[in-house]
């Protein structure tokens, strides 16, 4: 029987050493599912609310024992006896039980933990791979990895305001090839940085965190690493950034401390456009602040036909907010983070809405991750085509990459790597590098 028989939760630690929630769901058949919930560093103000204990005597107030109690108490009472195959009904009932718009009463981390664990238990009950259980027999697209190899902003203690500099191996034939290309470039970059006297310590997501003179210098180092690894910048490996602009948006200005700049929305759009002109940059995430909707419209009008503009903090995986963005012509892509909305069902609804509006979708990790690889299966399940799950070190990031290798192997000839499709969407010609 696929009836839920037991629900258990515990407090575990994430990749930053902070507590998070892990949930186990057991069915009457004996099948079970386990899931751990991630946590972000730069978060959107409209995200579903994770519950923390606020007890300064434990984990600096970041404990999650209250969320664990909510799983084992009210949420367990809600879902025990329900059919694990009825994911939508289970998720909706948990939302109703919480009764708040942002899941703040029981905690989004508690609700999501149960939602993910139920999904895994159901797939195990049916003996199906998780990606196939969620997406069906047409789930066969392996995502292009957006690999974060230089960290800044809230993810690293350095002078870079832009949070993530990423490489995108468009020219690979398979996901396995893409992973190899990324790893080779990552290790080459490490050697180049070290040779120039930079520290090669890594940030929260496994990218290097050097102090550099400017954002342009970061781009130049990455392009040099791509070339010295034997690849062509642009056609084989393109670039992407996550500006996380909400983090440096103050009093209506974009304050780039590392470059001593204070920019208006229009100036920030021009600043980002300069990168597009100088480098093979095909994707910008959160180029403007979540509250700067007029600026986002300008950004989309100026660059939306040329590159991918990904909304993270502005949309927070929320279908209602995404609908506003679609209506107003804001962005052309959405980042998908399970814990921003708090259930599997709502996440899938958001992805479907994005696809109907011809927005691209990027399934994403958080900076505080665990060894849980759910998002790897999710990216294939929905044929997202892109995944953001960090750099080429730290096992919390590699757990997702390694799961995608297994999925590609399992799909055999049916597997389709999304790189050529993405290249056709956004890559036209190789811009000339900045020679200064």
From Swiss-Prot:
Q: Which cofactor does it need?
A: Mg(2+)
Gene for this chain? eno
Tell me the protein's name: Enolase
Reply yes or no: does the keyword DNA damage apply: no
Name the NCBIfam families on file. Answer: eno
Instruction: Specify which residues bind Mg(2+) according to the UniProt entry for this protein.
Output: 242, 285, 312
Which domain of life does the protein's organism represent? Bacteria
Q: Which organism is it from?
A: Solidesulfovibrio magneticus (strain ATCC 700980 / DSM 13731 / RS-1) (Desulfovibrio magneticus)
Location of the active site:
205 (proton donor), 337 (proton acceptor)
